[in-house]
């Protein structure tokens, strides 16, 4: 897989970004871009969910070599932990040192309304699934890079964008959580909830990649708002907030050493 990327792009960067549902505007800022479809990469998983196109975009952003994954994989698509994290393994082989993981998430915190952004300083695995080949116990302190968190906060402040820190909760999906489940996660300290991201965080930490997780809060979680939840609504709201979200990511990338 890595050989194909090197052959087609001559990529020599250290920063990668994974885009969540409906989040893709940042790629319009990439110069000298090359697009590689997932389907053309040997042994690479394929996306099946709306809002996840399924391509790698490589190029430069403010003269910085960058790799962007448009589309990710989820447990509910039938993939294993190992398959979900194939992109992270690939990034490591490509020499990636910094990873920005994004997602569209439901807010469980009334102080973090839809349209705001959240940087994860901790996470909660509500699936109780793990890499079957790696039962190693790890400290949570290695998962979320403090310097990147500070960089995200200062970048958002510069752009006058509201950003909060909080705990991201991972659920299996594809069904949205019940109000009772949301109530329980809020009681345990959760601030945002989604169906992805944590396997990527764990694998990146194992591989020594410094990781930042950013959530675009697209809706309130079940039981907080009276509106019924749909994936289409999540994607539409993500697209509505995508410009400001992308600007924050660009500012962060510009500041990474």
Label every PLM stretch briefly:
Residues 1-140:
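Metabolite-binding pocket within alpha/beta catalytic cores that recognizes anionic/polar moieties
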Residues 5-8, 147, 151-162, 247-255:
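Generic non-transmembrane alpha-helical segments
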Residues 92-95, 186, 205:
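Non-catalytic positions within long, well-ordered alpha-helices that form the structural scaffold/packing
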Residues 97-98, 191, 210:
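Short acidic/polar active-site loop segments enriched in Thr and Asp
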Residues 154-191:
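Active-site/ligand-binding-proximal alpha/beta "capping" segment
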Residues 195-233:
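Zn-dependent metallopeptidase/amidohydrolase metal-coordination segment
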Residues 222-257:
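His/Asp/Glu-rich mid-to-C-terminal helical/loop segments that flank catalytic regions of hydrolases
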């Amino acid at each position: 897989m890595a050989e194909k990327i090197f052959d087609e792009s001559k990529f020599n960067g250290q920063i990668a970004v994974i885009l969540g549902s409906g989040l893709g505007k940042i790629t319009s800022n990439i110069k000298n871009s090359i697009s590689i479809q997932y389907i053309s990469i040997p042994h690479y998983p394929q996306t099946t969910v709306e809002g996840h196109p399924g391509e790698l975009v490589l190029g430069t952003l403010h003269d910085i070599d960058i790799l962007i994954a448009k589309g990710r994989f989820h447990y509910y698509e039938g993939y294993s932990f190992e398959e979900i994290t194939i992109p992270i393994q690939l990034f490591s082989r490509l020499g990636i040192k910094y990873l920005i993981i994004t997602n569209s998430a439901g807010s469980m915190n009334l102080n973090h309304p839809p349209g705001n952004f959240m940087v994860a300083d901790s996470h909660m695995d509500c699936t109780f699934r793990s890499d079957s080949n790696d039962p190693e116990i790890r400290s949570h302190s290695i998962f979320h890079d403090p310097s990147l968190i500070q960089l995200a906060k200062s970048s958002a402040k510069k752009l006058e964008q509201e950003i909060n820190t909080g705990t991201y909760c991972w659920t299996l999906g594809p069904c949205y959580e019940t109000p009772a489940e949301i109530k329980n996660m809020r009681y345990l300290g959760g601030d945002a909830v989604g169906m992805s991201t944590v396997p990527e965080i764990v694998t990146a930490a194992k591989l020594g990649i410094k990781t930042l997780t950013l959530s675009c809060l697209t809706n309130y979680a079940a039981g907080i708002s009276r509106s019924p939840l749909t994936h289409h609504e999540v994607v539409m709201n993500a697209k509505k907030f995508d410009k400001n979200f992308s600007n924050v990511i660009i500012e962060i990338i510009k500041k990474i050493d």
